[in-house]
Swiss-Prot record:
Gene it is expressed from: SCD6
Organism annotation: Saccharomyces cerevisiae (strain ATCC 204508 / S288c)
Omega-N-methylarginine modifications at: R306, R310
Phosphoprotein keyword on record: yes
Protein name: Protein SCD6
Highest taxon above the source species: Eukaryota
Motif segment (FFD box): 241-257
């Protein structure tokens, strides 16, 4: 490939931009192509002259390195590099209709320029450059110039500040107050607290007085140790008084193993009677279903209430003194009134 060094090369990138320059180096291992005296001719109608169309750039770059993945087409031209002109449309629109755009720069062009000669590229005074001889009206875009736009942002943009201030002056009434204050506060330099003062002592530090405080604390520790020793000594003297079994109350109580705690049920019954009364000695039957009996005596309604004992049979023997009649439900008969002035003797209450 050395026979092609110095030949005029026409290279079309994946973004449809055409670059023309002299072949400087080809690295087959890294897959790179290096051109010198490179000019960008733009897309030359490959975008159908629409809004994405990129127009020629008059800037000449000393050296540009292209990666193989960035190259779409490459051809060798026999013509002189100065005789090659970009393809421009016959009817160019006026310069006022083109949007403001940044100059198109080839990939890695700026890096190579800094390494070799660092050429100074003149910046246009207006957003739309004037017509270039042989190139027609040139209006580059900013969609494919990330590197150039970043470098432009690093320089102070006086024109953008003036335009923003004009727009802010027009729309000042509609702009929120907090945004105005935010813009003002962001431009102010940070202020330091000048009223802050540090108290600086005029005298030297007194080490003797501070050491005396520590020695005083040591004396208090000695006194505390003496108090603890005296308290321990008194406790030792009190331990000499042994336990007296004769005068102790708990030694007279017998243990459960010496006497038999199993009492007969008669003794337990008598103990319950003495403690809880006669009601505790009554037998308690809890068998249900064997029988049910009520023996009630009502005299003038209210002398006695319900009182009875549930036994093993069911029988009702009732005596009512209201009407003077004796009724026995088991006999199923009734006697005339006033026949008995007193209840019969055979009635059990």
């Amino acid at each position: 490939m050395s026979q092609y060094i110095g030949k005029t090369i026409s290279l079309i990138s994946v973004t449809d931009n055409r670059y023309v320059g002299l072949l400087e180096d080809i690295d087959s291992e890294k897959g790179t192509v290096t051109l010198k005296e490179v000019r960008c001719f733009g897309t030359e109608g490959r975008k159908n002259w629409g809004p994405e169309e990129i127009y020629p750039n008059p800037t000449v770059y000393n050296s540009v390195k292209f990666n193989g993945s960035e190259v779409k087409d490459l051809s060798i031209l026999d013509a002189n590099i100065n005789d090659i002109q970009p393809v421009v449309p016959q009817m160019m629109p006026p310069a006022s209709q083109f949007p403001p755009q940044q100059a198109q720069s080839p990939p890695q062009a700026q890096a190579q320029a800094h390494v070799q000669t660092n050429p100074q590229v003149p910046k246009p005074e207006s957003n739309v450059p004037a017509a270039v001889a042989g190139y027609g009206v040139y209006t580059p875009t900013s969609t494919e110039t990330a590197t150039a736009s970043m470098n432009d942002k690093s320089t102070p943009q006086d024109t953008n500040v003036n335009s923003q201030s004009r727009e802010r002056g027009k729309n000042g009434e509609n702009e929120p107050k907090y945004q105005r204050n935010k813009n003002r506060s962001s431009n102010r330099p940070p202020q330091s607290n000048r009223n802050f003062k540090v108290d600086i002592p005029n005298e030297d530090f007194d080490f003797q007085s501070n050491n005396a405080k520590f020695t005083k604390g040591d004396s208090t520790d000695v006194e505390k140790e003496k108090e603890l020793e005296s308290a321990v000594h008194k406790q030792d003297e009190s331990d000499e008084q042994f336990y007296n079994k004769k005068s102790s109350f708990f030694d007279t109580i017998s243990t459960s193993t010496e006497t038999n705690t199993n009492m007969r049920w008669q003794e337990e019954k008598m103990l319950n009677v003495d403690t809880f009364g006669q009601a505790s000695a009554r037998p308690r039957f809890h068998s249900r279903g064997l029988g049910r009996g009520r023996g009630n005596y009502r005299g003038n309604r209210g002398n006695r209430g319900r009182g009875g004992q549930r036994g093993n049979y069911q029988n009702r023997n009732n005596y009512q003194n209201d009407s003077g009649a004796y009724q026995n439900q088991n006999d199923s008969y009734s006697r005339p009134a006033n026949q008995f002035s007193q209840p019969p003797s055979n009635v059990e209450f």
